[in-house]
C-alpha cells in the first residue's frame, strides 16, 4: 500500500487564446475536456481580438454532432469564458483557478513566463493539445485538480522513491560560534514549547 496526497477530479481545463488562435482547435479541446463527465470544468480565457461569437457558434455546431452531447451539455453548466486584457492578466486569472490542464494556444510564448504559472500540467503552443497528454505525449496524467496544484504536483517517478535526510553536527562542522548558535536557538524553541527535556538534551 502507498499513501496518496489527494483524490483527484473532476477533470478541468483552462484554455488561453488570442486573436490568432484557431477557434476550431479551441472548441475541440474545450469539448474534449467537457466530455469527461457532467462535473467537468472548462474555462476559456480570451485576449482581445479572439472571435468569441464564432467560438460559441462552432461549439454549438460540434456539440450537435457529438456522441456524448448529453454529458457535455451538463458539463457546460460548469464552464465559462473569461475576458483578459493581456497575456499576463490571463495567466493571473488562470493562477486563481490552478486548473488540472492549462492550454496556452498562442505561438511564440516567452518561456520566461513559465515559472509564474500554476497548473497541474501546461500545454504550450497552438498544436499542443491536452488530449495528447491524456494518452501518449506526457506529462503524467495523474494531475492535481481543484486548485491542489497550489501545493502538490503530478505523479512522477520521484513519488516511488523513499527519501531521507542526514545531519552531522559538531563544533568543527560550523563556522565560528555557529554550533553554539544552533544549540541556543534550538533550546529557546524547545523551552517556548514547554519541552524541557528537549532543551536539557542540548545543554553542554
PLM-predicted stretches and their roles:
Residues 1-42:
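Conserved NAD(P)+-binding/catalytic subdomain of aldehyde/semialdehyde dehydrogenases
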Residues 6-12, 38-45, 49, 53, ...:
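Gly/Ser/Thr-rich active-site loops/lids in small-molecule metabolic enzymes
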Residues 7, 20-28, 45, 49, ...:
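Electropositive phosphate-/nucleotide-binding environments in soluble metabolic enzymes
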Residues 12-15, 40-44, 79-82, 100-103, ...:
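Structural motif
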Residues 18, 43, 78, 148, ...:
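Conserved short-loop catalytic and cofactor-binding motifs
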Residues 22, 32, 36, 44-119:
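A glycine- and small/hydrophobic-rich beta-loop-beta segment
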Residues 25, 29-32, 54-58, 92-93, ...:
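Alpha-helical scaffold segments in soluble metabolic enzymes
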Residues 111-204:
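C-terminal segments
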Amino acid at each position: 500500500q502507498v499513501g496518496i496526497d489527494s483524490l483527484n477530479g473532476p477533470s478541468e481545463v483552462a484554455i488561453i487564446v488570442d486573436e490568432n488562435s484557431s477557434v476550431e482547435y479551441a472548441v475541440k479541446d474545450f469539448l474534449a475536456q467537457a466530455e469527461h463527465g457532467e462535473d467537468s470544468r472548462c474555462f476559456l480565457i480570451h485576449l482581445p481580438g479572439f472571435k468569441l461569437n464564432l467560438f460559441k457558434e462552432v461549439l454549438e455546431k460540434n456539440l450537435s454532432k457529438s456522441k456524448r452531447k448529453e454529458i457535455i451539455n451538463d458539463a457546460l453548466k460548469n464552464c465559462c469564458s473569461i475576458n483578459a486584457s493581456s497575456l499576463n492578466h490571463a495567466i493571473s486569472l488562470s493562477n486563481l483557478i490552478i486548473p488540472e490542464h492549462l492550454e496556452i494556444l498562442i505561438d511564440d510564448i516567452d518561456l520566461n513566463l513559465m515559472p509564474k504559472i500554476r497548473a497541474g500540467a501546461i500545454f504550450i503552443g497552438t498544436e499542443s493539445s491536452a488530449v495528447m497528454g491524456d494518452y501518449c505525449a506526457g506529462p503524467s496524467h495523474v494531475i492535481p485538480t481543484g486548485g491542489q496544484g497550489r501545493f502538490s504536483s503530478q505523479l512522477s517517478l520521484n513519488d516511488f522513491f523513499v527519501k531521507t535526510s542526514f545531519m552531522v553536527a559538531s563544533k568543527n562542522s560550523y563556522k565560528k560560534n555557529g554550533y553554539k548558535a544552533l544549540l541556543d536557538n534550538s533550546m529557546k524553541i524547545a523551552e517556548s514549547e514547554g519541552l524541557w527535556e528537549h532543551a536539557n538534551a542540548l545543554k553542554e
